[in-house]
């Protein structure tokens, strides 16, 4: 029975991980389709597509999935699958500010779902396409340390447009202006050939809010509920947690 229970737990964890991967890949697929529809299917002449492909590869999205999304993007206008991006700000309980990025083919459905999510979280939805002063948009690169020399990489990044360079136990984190991210990523790749864990343009808070463990978990669960929605691509917040 113990062995059966262990196998059941492993199966459950693997199922949850597979479901999470599928959800992440689906979000990337939508971003790729939008980028292709706007700027064409050639990453060399479409920097937005090039960046999204880099993000997807950093999260181990299979090449076949990327190619399918590009093909769907090329036919998106003819088959009516047109996605639009909208951004909403808002607040959750305890003064937590959020930015919600939506990518949807049905704006009315997406907004109705978003309003319901804020109500359930005892939060308040803000204005569309209004970014609160608490957040700043930056390019973000995360690289596995492996055997990379920290000083060499840091100096190279700062010489090539990076604004900040940080490290933790396993990774280097590099910040830059959004317009610099593709160029900086390409220069790092040519020089060091590292393993990128993240390549993205994100919103970073200028001020953090720290809560006790119980309320932190409640807010994180609320954010997870937002991310479970099929139309929500990302949620940025100013909750500080260990």
From Swiss-Prot:
One of its GO terms (biological process) is regulation of DNA-templated transcription. The keyword Transcription regulation applies. Pfam families: TACO1_YebC_N (PF20772), Transcrip_reg (PF01709). GO terms for cellular component: cytosol. Transmembrane segments: none annotated. The keyword Transcription regulation applies. It comes from the Bacteria. Gene3D superfamilies: 1.10.10.200, 3.30.70.980. It is found in: Cytoplasm. GO terms for molecular function: DNA binding. Keywords: Cytoplasm, DNA-binding, Transcription, Transcription regulation. Its main location: cytoplasm. InterPro entries: Integrase-like_N, TACO1_YebC-like_2nd/3rd_dom, TACO1_YebC_N, Transcrip_reg_TACO1-like, Transcrip_reg_TACO1-like_dom3, YebC-like. PANTHER family: TRANSCRIPTIONAL REGULATORY PROTEIN YEBC-RELATED, TRANSLATIONAL ACTIVATOR OF CYTOCHROME C OXIDASE 1. NCBIfam families: PRK00110.1 (NF001030), PRK12378.1 (NF009044), YebC/PmpR family DNA-binding transcriptional regulator (TIGR01033). Belongs to the TACO1 family. This is Probable transcriptional regulatory protein MHP7448_0474. It comes from Mesomycoplasma hyopneumoniae (strain 7448) (Mycoplasma hyopneumoniae).
């Amino acid at each position: 029975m113990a062995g059966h229970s262990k196998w059941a737990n492993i199966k459950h964890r693997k199922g949850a991980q597979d479901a999470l991967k599928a959800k992440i890949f689906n979000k990337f697929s939508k971003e790729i389709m939008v980028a292709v529809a706007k700027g064409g299917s050639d990453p060399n002449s479409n920097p937005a597509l090039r960046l999204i492909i880099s993000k997807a590869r950093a999260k181990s999205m299979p090449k076949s999935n990327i190619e399918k999304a590009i093909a769907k993007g090329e036919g998106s206008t003819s088959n009516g699958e047109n996605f639009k991006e909208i951004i909403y700000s808002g607040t959750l309980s305890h003064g937590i500010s959020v930015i919600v990025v939506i990518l949807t083919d049905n704006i009315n459905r997406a907004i109705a779902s978003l309003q319901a999510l804020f109500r359930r979280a005892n939060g308040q939805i803000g204005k569309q396409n209004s970014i609160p002063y608490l957040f700043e948009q930056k390019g973000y690169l995360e690289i596995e340390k492996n055997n990379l020399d920290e000083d060499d990489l840091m100096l190279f990044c700062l010489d090539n447009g990076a604004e900040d360079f940080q490290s933790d136990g396993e990774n280097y984190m590099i910040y830059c202006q959004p317009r610099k991210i593709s160029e900086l990523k390409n220069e790092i790749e040519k020089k060091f050939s590292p393993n990128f864990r993240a390549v993205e343009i994100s919103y970073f808070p200028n001020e953090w809010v720290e809560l006790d463990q119980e309320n932190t978990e409640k807010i994180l669960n609320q954010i997870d509920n937002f991310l479970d929605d099929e139309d929500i691509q990302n949620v940025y917040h100013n909750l500080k947690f260990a």
